[in-house]
C-alpha cells in the first residue's frame, strides 16, 4: 500500500457504520450494567442493619428499579435524538445530558444491588423503544427536539418527587440518590429551555405521561 493510501485510510472520517457500532457498544454497556459513574455516589448515609422491614425493602427496590429503567430510557432517548440531530450545539447538549445520566444509571444499579434486587428484565425493550422515539423526535426540528428533552425532564422531576414522598423515611441512602437525581434533571430541563426548546402540544405531553405510566407500573415488578 502506498504512503498516500495509508495516510488516507488513517485520516478517514467516521462514517455511519462507525456511528452505528458506537451506539451498539454504548447500548451493550448500559444494558450489561458496565456503565460507571464519574461523580461520587450520593448515598453516604450508613446502611443501618434492619432499618427496613422486608416489605419496605421490596418497595424501595421496586422504586429504584423504576428509576433505573428511567435512566436506561433517558440514555437511549438522548442518544437517539443526538444521532439524528444536525445542529451541532443541540447535538452536543443532548450528548452531554446523556453522559450525565450515566451517573444516575450507575447509582441506581448500585442501590439495587445493596437492596438485594436487580434491574428490570425488560431493559432491552425499553432501550430499543426509547432510542427509536428519540430518532423520531429529532425530525421535528431543533426547537421541538429540545422541547421533548425539557418535557421529559419535567415529567421525570415530578416522578422523582413522588418517589421522595413514598420512599421509607429511614431509607436515607435511596432518598439521597433520588434527591440528587431530581436536582440534575431540573438542570437538564433548564438547559434545554435556554437552548431554545419550545413547549410541546398538550396531546404529545399526555401521550408521554401515558407511556411513562405503563413503563413505571411494569418496571416496579419486572
Swiss-Prot record:
Cofactor annotation comment: Binds 2 iron ions per subunit.
InterPro entries assigned to the protein according to its UniProt record, in alphabetical order: COQ7_proteobact (IPR047809), Ferritin-like (IPR012347), Ferritin-like_SF (IPR009078), Ubq_synth_Coq7 (IPR011566)
Membrane topology: Peripheral membrane protein
GO biological process: ubiquinone biosynthetic process
EC number(s) given by UniProt: 1.14.99.60
Pathway: Cofactor biosynthesis; ubiquinone biosynthesis
Reported cofactor(s): Fe cation
CDD domains noted in UniProt: DMQH
Subcellular location: Cell membrane
GO cellular component: plasma membrane
Binding sites annotated in the UniProt record for Fe cation 1: 71, 101, 104, 185
Reactions performed catalytically: a 5-methoxy-2-methyl-3-(all-trans-polyprenyl)benzene-1,4-diol + AH2 + O2 = a 3-demethylubiquinol + A + H2O
Pfam families in UniProt: COQ7
Role description: Catalyzes the hydroxylation of 2-nonaprenyl-3-methyl-6-methoxy-1,4-benzoquinol during ubiquinone biosynthesis.
Protein name: 3-demethoxyubiquinol 3-hydroxylase
Species of provenance: Bordetella parapertussis (strain 12822 / ATCC BAA-587 / NCTC 13253)
